[in-house]
């Protein structure tokens, strides 16, 4: 009986630690929900991507030039606005606006999902770019018999995909079951 009690206590501690590492940030919850709904992607995908990309730091400037919650580069921001959203491009400073950053990131993830149809491939393209992923998909060394990526030759992109997929699984377990 005592061991069962310790088991429940350990599970509770483990869950609390996981929720600390993979939070539902109330600060961005409404914008994440709205952007996911607007662009037809599962809310959990945005939570996992933001957690992995920026850890919810809206002013983060990444080493690759990415800015904000979704770590979009100014070039990606312009491409998303003009090619996907069919909008006039705004100043890259808008990437620091969490709502705009999330909207553009969600639009891009939606576009990538329509293009690839598999979340692992979507996350690879989100990290490495579509031209790179398209080249990998044409190389039999990197795809399985179904034409899906089986291994990612870029270690940084492979780690990113693994991390986002892990975050997705934990967000589902903790909040979206």
Where are these regions (language model features)?
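Catalytic and substrate-binding regions of cell-wall glycan-acting enzymes that process beta-1,4-linked
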Residues: 124-177
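Hydrophobic membrane-insertion alpha-helices, especially the h-region
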Residues: 1-11
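Second-shell loop/turn segments in exported
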Residues: 17-22, 32-35, 58-67, 87-98, ...
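Cell-wall polysaccharide-cleaving catalytic domain and substrate-binding groove, primarily
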Residues: 51-76, 108, 129
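Substrate-binding/active-site groove segments that recognize
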Residues: 64-87, 104-105, 136, 143
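Solvent-exposed, polar/charged alpha-helical surfaces in well-ordered, non-transmembrane soluble domains
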Residues: 30-34, 47, 78, 103-110, ...
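Surface-exposed patches in mature extracellular/periplasmic domains of secreted proteins
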Residues: 44-47, 60, 116-125, 175-177
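Export/targeting segments at the very N-terminus of extracytoplasmic proteins
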Residues: 9-58, 81-84, 167, 174-175
């Amino acid at each position: 009986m005592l061991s069962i009690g310790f088991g429940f206590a350990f599970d509770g501690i483990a869950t609390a630690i996981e929720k600390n590492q993979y939070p539902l940030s109330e600060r961005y919850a409404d914008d994440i929900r709205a952007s996911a709904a607007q662009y037809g992607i599962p809310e959990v995908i945005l939570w996992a991507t933001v957690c992995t990309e920026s850890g919810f730091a809206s002013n983060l400037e990444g080493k690759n030039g990415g800015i904000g919650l979704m770590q979009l580069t100014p070039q990606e921001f312009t491409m998303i606005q003009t090619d996907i959203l069919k909008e006039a491009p705004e100043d890259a400073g808008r990437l620091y606006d969490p709502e705009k950053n999330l909207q553009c990131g969600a639009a891009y993830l939606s576009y990538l999902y329509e293009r690839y149809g598999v979340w692992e491939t979507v996350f690879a393209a989100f990290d490495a770019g579509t031209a790179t992923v398209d080249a990998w998909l044409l190389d039999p060394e990197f795809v399985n018999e179904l034409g899906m990526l089986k291994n990612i030759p870029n270690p940084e992109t492979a780690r990113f995909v693994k991390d986002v997929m892990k975050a997705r699984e934990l967000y589902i377990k903790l909040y979206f079951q």
